Regions:
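Acidic, Ser/Pro/Thr-rich low-complexity regulatory regions
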Residues: 1-97
Length: 97
């Protein structure tokens, strides 16, 4: 499979994963795991700077999940999660290739 085809396939998978989360069909811990796995899959197919950006956004999502495991999920957490998902979608669109 070519790098460009693989990259598009993985990006579509990330987008689908976010859509499933937003629709309530995927819990936050699974969203975090899926994002981590799919971003790792992109490593040989994408520039390191972009991978670092995606990983940073994933870390923000994972941190919200970890805080939610310890304390009730608050409005600030929800806003941070929404912002991270929005930025992740923008990053995917700009680097679709």
């Amino acid at each position: 499979m070519s790098t460009q085809i693989c990259r598009r396939f993985v990006i579509d998978g990330i987008r689908d994963t976010m859509d499933h989360y937003r629709a309530g069909a995927l819990p936050l811990h699974r969203l975090s795991w899926e994002l981590h796995s799919r971003i790792d899959t992109l490593v040989p197919h994408a520039p390191a700077v972009w991978i670092d950006q995606l990983r940073d956004l994933h870390r923000r999502i994972a941190e919200v999940h970890e805080r939610g495991e310890r304390t009730p999920f608050g409005e600030l957490d929800r806003r941070e999660l929404d912002d991270s998902l929005r930025l992740l979608r923008v990053a995917l669109e700009h680097n679709r290739g």
